[in-house]
Regions:
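Intrinsically disordered, low-complexity, charge-dense segments enriched in Lys/Arg
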Residues: 3-4, 8, 81-137
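Residues that form generic nucleotide/phosphate-binding pockets
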Residues: 14, 18, 71, 117
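Short secondary-structure junctions and interdomain/linker hinges
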Residues: 18-25, 79, 106, 125
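Generic structural signal for short, solvent-exposed loop/turn connectors between secondary structure elements
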Residues: 25-27, 32-34, 63-66, 80-93
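Short aromatic-glycine-(Arg/Gly/Cys) micro-motifs in beta-strand/loop hairpins
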Residues: 31-57
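Aromatic- and glycine-enriched beta-alpha-beta binding-site module
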Residues: 47-51, 55-80
């Protein structure tokens, strides 16, 4: 086995664990498609969280294994909570609570990322809807 295989296998184990904890079907690491989410370790050892729609790259986030696990978990939590909770303040609070069960660092990161998104898209007033994480946003 190569280092890349070891890294892919370790990532698959963690994706499976998170999926089970979230109550969703796991996804295969390394299976690349041109329509949907792709999680893979590239030949250079970099970890990718990429999304394709109809053959066109929507995004390709590159980071550590922890980054990939955070993106995977946060995306699932955000999607699932949005389906169940209409009130945005309650939605952001529930996202924080669920992510905290996996990692308090991920929960805080999600709040910081959401605040940055609000600023980027000209909605800084929406930061007030986010839970207090004990640090300035």
């Amino acid at each position: 086995m190569t280092d890349l295989d070891d890294k892919s296998n370790a990532l698959q184990i963690e994706i499976d664990r998170l999926s089970e904890g979230l109550g969703v079907r796991s996804m295969p690491v390394g299976l690349r498609t041109n329509d949907g989410l792709n999680i893979f370790v590239a030949d250079d050892g970099s970890c990718h969280y990429a999304f394709y729609e109809r053959g066109k790259l929507g995004f390709d986030r590159v980071g550590s294994i922890d980054d990939l696990l955070y993106w995977y978990c946060a995306d699932i939590v955000t999607d699932e909570v949005a389906k169940r909770v209409g009130d945005r303040t309650e939605r952001f609070k529930l996202e924080y609570e669920i992510l905290s069960q996996f990692s308090t660092d991920w929960a805080k990161r999600n709040v910081r990322d959401t605040a940055a998104m609000f600023r980027k898209y000209g909605k800084p007033q929406d930061i007030a809807l986010l839970p207090d994480i004990g640090e300035p946003l």
